[in-house]
Each structure stands twice: as structure tokens, then as C-alpha cells.
Amino acid sequence: MQFVGDIRKLLQRDPLDEDAAARLWGAILDEALDDIELGAVLGALTASSATREELMGLYRAAQERMDRAPLLAGARAVAIPAYGLVPGEALMASLAAALLARFEVPVAVHGILDSPCGVSSACVLRELGVLPCASLALAGESLRTERITFIPAQLLGARFASLIALRGRLGVEGPAHLVAQVLDPTNAGAVRLSFSVAGTASEQLETLATQIDGDFVALTWPAGRSPSSLSTRPRIESIRDGSREVLFEADVQEMRTAIPQPPEDAQGMARWIKRVMAGAIPVPVPAVNLVAACLYAVGHAPDFTQAKAIAAVSAGRLAA
């Protein structure tokens, strides 16, 4: 009966403050609520209707309970979320992971194995030889030796992963899908990527990222675009402890490009990425820009100008 009042407020859409939301989400993650109470909470809160305070409450509850992959001291990783929140994210997530690993930047992709809105990053990475890790210890070892790993959401927290899995039954994204984007799956303060599209529920990520300590590289595509559109650069921002810096503005229209559009299936995407990595296909400009932003964020360059130069020179060498 402890949370009856909070649940009643949610059903009436009287928003909870952050502390109350953290207590309620904590109870959910601790399996202290029964199925009827859980259903009431999830019925009242979709990804688009949850307030910033309610999302921050879930973030706090998840952070306190999640497990993390070990990372060697001094190694700054990039964490890439892969939860199917943004259609087409698998292409950009997988390509970014492959490119960053070339720079010896550890990349921890974390998310779901199958996406309800198209090909999942896990499927593309599997075709690239990156298999889902069976444990966080193995994930840490992969980060050390291979510089890239895929961490299933289940390893970070079984109960949190079960909230994400409910999308298949509810038909809509819940608050967990948004919060998953800003989680750090490592124990060493990774730079976190976030993907969002203007005019969708994912747009709340910009506000959420500014409320959380740590570093983010936030990508926002214009309305109607997606990460699979390699002819349109998203707005790319660096967010450091809530302070925002625009690194690249979004393209207002599609760029003309001779780069062939990748296939839409996992095997085809993986083949296309392999051709990019082999220099047979030029690195798309949005991907070069993203790499530059990440190199800047993890400290692989003393300033952003040099980060852009390093990324551009590397892209040119691949194509040479």
C-alpha cells in the first residue's frame, strides 16, 4: 500500500517529483510492486508523457542498481545505446563503433538483441564478428583486447531489461527506452552517445542529458530524417556536465553524394560497413563528423579543430 498514492497521482496525470519517482521506480526494479500496480504505472507513463522529473527518477533508480563492465583505469570509452528507440539507428551505431575502434577508442554498445522497428545493432555487429557478451567480465576483456563489445541489456539489470522488453506487448516505448540511452554501461565514466529525431519522444533526450553528470555526444536529426539517412548530417552537440556546445549544425537539406546507400538487412549493412573500413566506399560525412566529436569528447585530441583534422585525415587514408 506504500505506493498507492503515487500510482493514483500518475493515473490522474498529476506528475511526481524526482524523489517520489525514484522511490517508485526503485520499488519496480526491486520487484516490490505486483503486476497490477506495475501495469498501472506503465499505462500512465509512456515515453512521450513522462516528465523530466519522472525520467530522472527512473535514471537514479537504474543507476543505483545496474551492473557495469570493468574498464582499465585511464581508458575512456564511448558508450553507444542500441535499444531501437530511433528507426535506422543500427547503421550509424555499428559504423561509428567500427570507426572508433580503429582509433583504439574502447566502444561499449549496449542494448537489445532484436529490434521491433527494423534491424538491430546486435544483428549487424554479429555479422561484423562482434558477438553479444555472456558476462560483464567478458565485456571488459573485449574492450581491452578488441576495443569493441556488445553488452545485452539483461547483463546491466534484469528487471530494467524486462521493462524494455514490454514494448513488444504494449506497442509503445516506455520511459525505460529513453533512460537506457543515457546509461553508462562501464565503470569508468564513458562518453555516451544519444540518438534523437525532432518531433518524436526521443527529443526528450536532449533535456535529460543536460541534467546528468558526465559527458555526452548528442545527435539530433531533423523531423522525418533518421540515422540511416547518410546524406543528412544531424546536429551534433557535446554536453559536459550539463553545459552544451554545438559542434556541427544539422544539414537543412540532403547532401548530394555518390556513396551507395547501404542495404536494409543486417548482412547487407555489415558488408557495406566492411567496404567502408576497407576503403572501397568513402566514409560518409556525417560519420566523419561523429568520429571527430567523439575523439574530442574522449580527449584523443587537444581541441576540436585537431579532432576534426584527425578524423578527416583518417577517412582519407581509408579511401586511399
Where is each model-derived feature located?
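Active-site cofactor/substrate anionic-group-binding motifs, chiefly glycine-
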Residues: 49-108
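Short, glycine-rich nucleotide/cofactor-binding loops
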Residues: 30-31, 79-90, 194-197, 278
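A glycine-rich phosphate/pyrophosphate-binding beta-strand-loop-alpha-helix module
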Residues: 90-139, 144
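Short glycine/serine- and small hydrophobic-enriched flexible loop segments
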Residues: 43-46, 101-102, 292-300
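Short, structured segments at the rim of ligand-binding sites
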Residues: 27-30, 44, 50, 55, ...
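N-terminal glycine-rich anion-binding loops that anchor highly charged ligand groups
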Residues: 1, 10-53, 69, 282-289
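Glycine-rich anion-binding loops and their surrounding alpha/beta cores
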Residues: 9, 15-16, 58, 63-73, ...
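Acidic, glycine-rich active-site loops and adjacent beta-strand->loop/helix elements
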Residues: 83-86, 113-117, 222-223
